[in-house]
Amino acid sequence: YARSLERTEAFFWQFCDQYLELVKTRAYGSRGDDAARSAQAALQLTLSTLLRLFAPFLPFVTEEVWSWWQSGSVHRAPWPNASQLRDAAADGNPLAYAMGAEILSAARRAKTESKRSLKWPVDVIDVTDTTPRTEAFQSVLEDVREAANATSVSVAVGAEASVAVTLANDPDAG
């Protein structure tokens, strides 16, 4: 019981910290309707699955949230089957998500270390990594750029993986 709850909570917080931040602006339509629908569908599937996972531990809360957008009871809802989840993730590359989360974390870390707000603008994020990783990253590059509030993201292939974040200058320091 405790281990199941611990793993579900860990996934929930990781999802909120990383994925939700990566797709938030796209879900609101920053890159058009098709991109927004794609992000919203992924978020909807994840919320539905998370509610089912949390239902045994938080029965009343999950039932209430479920009723806001679904009919019936979360406790009687079928689990998503493996083929549904595979189909939903068919175009996704787990490496792309991992790269996006890693690079967004580097941008956040740079802002925190400089005592800046997470909304502080970034001039450029320079990413160097292997060919397979940089190719995977291309599919989430715009999500990372928007989430980090970066003007640009440059990607180069190299043997040593690195992420360098250059924050924008303080407009009041001038």
What are these regions (language model features)?
Residues 1-174:
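Feature 926 captures the class I aminoacyl-tRNA synthetase adenylation module centered on the KMSKS loop
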